């Protein structure tokens, strides 16, 4: 089962109703991490109790939450939909996560393949958010607040902007029943969201870039 929202690392500037929101690099990925934590604890522990193997990832244009299970599918569906549908953030939990994600950022800084991709994007684009690493930087994620995360949830974590897909030993009726149980079938007004894009010249930002890394 995979539950995905059309919200990724490049969605950093948008208008939510009458409010303009400008995000630092790395918010979508940071939010992905925080979705697994609520007032009751860790969603990974809940998935473990149902026997499911859960994971998630953030890309430039989407965030996806997924699990694989051979039994207790209903229980795992409830865990997935509840954790995504009922976010919980505090400054204390955000401060804790900043250190964890900071280590992940440093790990990717040591990846030649990933540095090549980000370096290429920096050469191609002048100001488009795709220039920034999906995880952001240690400095950018240090500015993340609960309000930012709640704004992102309100704008992009709504049924009209999400897709739920399932494959395997299940039925459409079982999946729809889970959506019904967790309130996804209830009519709700769609938020007025407008993505704001920066003007991007038709020329490359740089013709070349040199990255030097230590050899292990």
For each feature predicted by the language model, list its residue ranges:
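His/Glu-rich zincin catalytic helix
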Residues: 1-43, 150-216
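Acidic/histidine-enriched segments that form metal/cofactor-coordinating
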Residues: 39-152, 173, 197, 201
């Amino acid at each position: 089962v995979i539950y995905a929202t059309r919200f990724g690392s490049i969605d950093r500037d948008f208008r939510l109703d009458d409010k303009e929101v400008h995000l630092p690099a790395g918010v979508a990925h940071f939010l992905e991490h925080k979705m697994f934590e609520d007032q009751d604890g860790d969603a990974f522990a809940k998935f473990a109790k149902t026997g499911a193997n859960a994971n998630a990832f953030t890309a430039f244009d989407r965030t996806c939450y997924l699990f694989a299970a051979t039994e207790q599918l209903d229980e795992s569906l409830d865990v997935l939909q509840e954790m995504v549908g009922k976010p919980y953030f505090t400054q204390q939990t955000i401060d804790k996560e900043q250190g964890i994600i900071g280590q992940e950022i440093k790990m990717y800084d040591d990846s030649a393949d990933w540095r090549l991709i980000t370096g290429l994007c920096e050469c191609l684009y002048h100001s488009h958010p795709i220039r920034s690493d999906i995880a952001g930087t240690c400095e950018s994620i240090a500015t993340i607040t609960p309000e930012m995360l709640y704004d992102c949830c309100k704008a992009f974590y709504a049924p009209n902007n999400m897709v739920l897909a399932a494959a395997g030993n299940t039925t459409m009726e079982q999946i729809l029943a889970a959506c019904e149980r967790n309130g996804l079938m209830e009519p709700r007004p769609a938020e007025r969201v407008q993505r704001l894009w920066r003007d991007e010249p038709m020329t490359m930002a740089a013709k070349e870039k040199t990255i030097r890394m230590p050899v292990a």
